[in-house]
Amino acid sequence: MSPPKPFPILRLPFLAIEEVFKAMDPIEIINFSMISKRTKEIGKRMSFYSNYAIELYVHEMPEIRLHGTKDVVSSFYVMTSDKEMDGKIEEKEWGRYIIRKVFKYDPIDEWKQWFKYVMEIFRKQAIDVLTMTLTTFVDQNVSIIDFLKSNVKSVDRCSLYQRDEQINVDKHTAYLLDNVKINSELCYDAYINNDDFNPKIPKSLQELRIYNSKWIEYERLLEIDCKSVILKNNPISNKEWNVFVKKWRVMETNQNVEYLELD
């Protein structure tokens, strides 16, 4: 029995090509786009990419997660000191999820290059999720933030964490909040080491959650203007709280706030 003939996808009308692309998972689309300049240009022309979501994670290993129309693809970049493993790829399927591991000497650099290509193919300027543990790649935090500043117009939901209390990430936190635009949600779960910590807090968020908010005193609270505000471990006194509530009720301050929780 002779092998099947290659399917001439590029000879199809564009609408038919687009239907073929809709049946592909995001990795298949990216792999197709890498074949030639022509396939790359065709890959960038699809009209349904607005339904795709792109998420970035920097925890134990950097990750790019792509939510397609049917499948969710996660690409992990795993640091390796084994020369034989450098560049190797492992893929596993689990239901709707496709897990892709890429072994690299410099996972952050590879993660950046792969992300730029993903953004180009799917014609994205903003990303849906950024989740970052600031104590994982401390020496590269500034480089990562500068990269995001140059390549991402905005982030819809951002979560920042600190796993090692002994590592001071105050400056990195402030630098990220000064340079990355956050549209909808900010979750901040880190320890504060400096009394003068005073980062920019985005305005008009749908939700602001700060789990160690000792640095947010009364005057700073008056500046917060988000729809839902949750502040844990907060030092505001009962007297200040009562004054704030009175101002809030008569709409003298924080007019966008609909829900406020202090602990």
What function would you assign to each model-found segment?
Residues 1-263:
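Non-core capping and flanking segments associated with repeat-based/extracellular domains
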